[in-house]
């Protein structure tokens, strides 16, 4: 009997596999790895891979399948897993990738995986490309990410879209907004929207960058400080405590959000968010902090380095 290991990027995808295999005579090992690799310090617990455990499971399995969602976080997780397997010199021939055209969590339990995506063997070229991709993302500046070769990206069907979406989440050249901040402001510019509406906008994005806990923390950040961009938020919750208090969560979720005058000015390109509010977040291995930082000019497709402090 073949020892099959299935790795997923979230618990919902693992739920699909468990439901699908519930009546099988041979049960695979199904392991969920819900790491947060976007806008999170890569050294933090939220982004930490239990490397020894995962590599041990991969080594012991006769066959391993990685169920890859098309969103950027799942693409990065795949790159990280293959990078670690490559560094550990595991047999890449036993690792197979299933690139879902949609999130695996949305697949009906009665639908076999082969009907959604056939497995692709992670050969040496895949492992080397994944290593280049992860190394570029974890670098202390986004320059290596921009310089990734089209050949490396092409080994994975959704990686080019993830590459582009992540560049767009760097602070923009004119407004200082990343893609996530821009999506929030753009969603409520016409009329007030509830927090639940904003969460759905993120979930339905063609290339969602962050999940619900991080969306909650982002809204709290945009509503806080001496120069808030949004108003109307009831309470402030972080990404790791948003489910601790049901009453607080209900009040937070039902908040009617609107743009402040500053928020409208930033969205219109009249004011630079980073210059006014500063910034304190991570983009891969790049720390974005203070009132000057790396930026992305989508029109010219160029990175703009932080301004050097005046002598």
List the predicted regions and their residue ranges.
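A structured, charge-rich N-terminal accessory region that forms the first stable segment of a protein
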Residues: 1-47
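Short acidic, hydrophobic short linear motifs in intrinsically disordered regions
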Residues: 191-203
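Charge-enriched amphipathic alpha-helical scaffolds
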Residues: 203-236, 240-241
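A broadly used, surface-exposed interaction patch
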Residues: 38-65, 86-88, 93
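Acidic beta-strand-to-loop metal/phosphate-binding motif
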Residues: 7, 61-73
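Conserved beta-strand -> loop -> alpha-helix junction used to position metal-binding or nucleic-acid-contacting
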Residues: 29-37, 87-118
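Accessory beta->alpha helical hairpin/"wing" motif in late/C-terminal subdomains of nucleic-acid enzymes
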Residues: 229-310
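A conserved mid-domain beta-alpha-beta active-site/ligand-binding segment of alpha/beta enzyme cores
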Residues: 113-193
């Amino acid at each position: 009997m073949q020892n099959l290991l299935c790795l997923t990027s979230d618990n919902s995808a693992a739920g699909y596999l468990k439901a699908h295999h519930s009546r099988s005579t041979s049960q695979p090992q199904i392991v969920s790895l819900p790491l947060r690799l976007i806008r999170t310090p890569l050294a933090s617990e939220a982004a930490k891979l239990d490397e020894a455990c995962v590599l041990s499971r991969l080594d012991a399995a006769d066959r391993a399948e990685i169920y890859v969602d098309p969103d950027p976080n799942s693409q990065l997780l795949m790159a990280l897993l293959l990078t670690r397997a490559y560094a550990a010199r595991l047999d890449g021939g036993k690792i197979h990738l299933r690139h879902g055209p949609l999130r695996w969590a949305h697949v009906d339990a009665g639908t076999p995986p082969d009907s959604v995506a056939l497995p692709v063997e992670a050969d040496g070229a895949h492992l080397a490309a994944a290593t280049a991709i992860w190394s570029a993302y974890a670098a202390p500046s986004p320059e290596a990410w921009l310089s990734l070769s089209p050949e490396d990206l092409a080994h994975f069907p959704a990686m080019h879209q993830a590459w582009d979406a992540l560049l767009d989440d760097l602070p923009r050249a004119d407004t200082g907004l990343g893609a996530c901040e821009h999506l929030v402001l753009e969603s409520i510019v016409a009329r007030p929207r509830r927090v639940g509406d904003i969460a759905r906008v993120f979930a339905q994005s063609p290339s969602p960058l962050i999940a619900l806990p991080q969306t909650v923390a982002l809204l709290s950040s945009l509503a806080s400080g001496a120069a808030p961009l949004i108003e109307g938020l009831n309470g402030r919750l972080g990404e790791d405590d948003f489910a601790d208090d049901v009453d607080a969560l209900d009040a937070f979720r039902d908040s009617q959000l609107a743009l402040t005058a500053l928020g409208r000015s930033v969205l219109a390109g009249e004011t630079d968010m980073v210059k006014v509010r500063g910034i304190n977040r991570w983009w891969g291995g790049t720390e974005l902090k203070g009132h000057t930082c790396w930026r992305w000019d989508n029109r010219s497709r160029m990175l703009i380095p932080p301004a050097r402090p005046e002598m």
